Amino acid sequence: MKRSDNSDNDKEIKKQKLLQELGGLQIPYLTPADEGFQQLWKTKYSKLALKEAHSTPLELHSQVQTALSILLERGCLFRDLVQMKGKDMFTPVSRVLIGAPGHTYKYLNTRLFTIPWPASGAVVRYCDDEVARACQAVKDLNDYLCVEAKRCLTRREGALSAAETTANVTREMERETNNRTVFNVALLNYMDPAAMSYLKEEPYFGMGRMAVSWHHDENLVDRSPVAVYSYSYKDTESCSAEGDEKPVSGRDCTVWRIALKVAWDIHTAGLALPLHSDDLNMTHQHCVLAGARPRFSSTHRMAECSAGTLEYIFGRCQVALNNLHKDPSSERPSLVSLEVSVLKQAEEIHNEVEFEWLRQYWFQGRRYAKFSDWWCKPMERLEELWREMELMTWLVLCTVEGEGCPAADRREAVQGVLPLLEERNQLRQHWRARCQSRLAKTLPADEEPICHPYWSDHNASMPLPFDLQEILSRLEDIVSPTGL
């Protein structure tokens, strides 16, 4: 469940190797003012599309910009306490996820839960009318961008010659395009560079300060586009620059820019495009270069939610709880099957519910109450099901430690579930430590991480202790060479 540091370490190794190859030199990059820019865009970055502000309805601009301003003024955008390379840190960007009810989006070991936008069949009670209108505006923008993204992909794929295209192929292309352009979440970002004491310099091209480092967007539906609405919030003093040299045309440090490069390639020139207020960009690999003024972006995407919706996790709970039986008259619980594969599956789901959902949700404090009470009931229900799974773990332990269990069956069952219980204990300590960290304590009261579920050893309502170390020691004795 815990995000592996391996991928971060691999990326850092690749980065250092490339920088070593460069030997202090910088890779060239082109801007719209440079000769060869259009040819480079066409040949190396053809999947980037830019839609200028004047081609988007003025009324939509007004609604969206009002919504973004309201969310900022109401304190509804948050700097996430994420984990990179095993260390907690705050994102330089404040953000919030708005999207389809019951959906989530995970990045940097952090699962964001959607503030639900209005949707057919969903009853959403917003905290007030302003927040409701803001969420509706984001939904309207999302609908517009879905149409624009579909149009863009259709134009690209329609470039196939008629000789290469059959009616069946055309219909299949249309279906695939439709499936890839139904954005289900919008990640809203805000950053004021003047409020940041430090921003990293772009390391490969010398492009300037980065608001968002080079990255691939995580957890997207394969080959789906990302649509980004950019809005420069208000004027500030121009950014400071060394010396008195006038910024090179197209490379102005006061202007927000999006930069693109070929991943792990030091031979292909990069691109840097200015982001004028209201522009739309679609791409997968990029960094964002900070300008002087505060900026919003609304990034619309098809989050890969096969394991990230309430429907999914409640379905998983049902699979686990199928192995729990309660006597209709006495309510006495028992396990339906003692097959090791069944026991393991239930414990895997138990861990998933606790660490991918409950602890992720409560680690973000009570921030979601600023918008709506929509998540309260589902999370209460999820915790009830998790408690049933705690009961199931207790039943497993009663069985394997009972006198009537044959030694061979006992050993096989313990070997199956022990790694999952060890992981559970480790992750409980990990999340508790994160909740008590120095950075966590700096957050406002309604954003401060909550270590939940947490209970003392004297809590009679819980069948097992929070700390499983004593139980693990007993189980380790069973599977040791000298165990019974």
Predicted regions and their residues:
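Non-heme Fe(II) oxygenase metal-center motifs and adjacent flexible, charged/small-residue loops
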Residues: 1-484
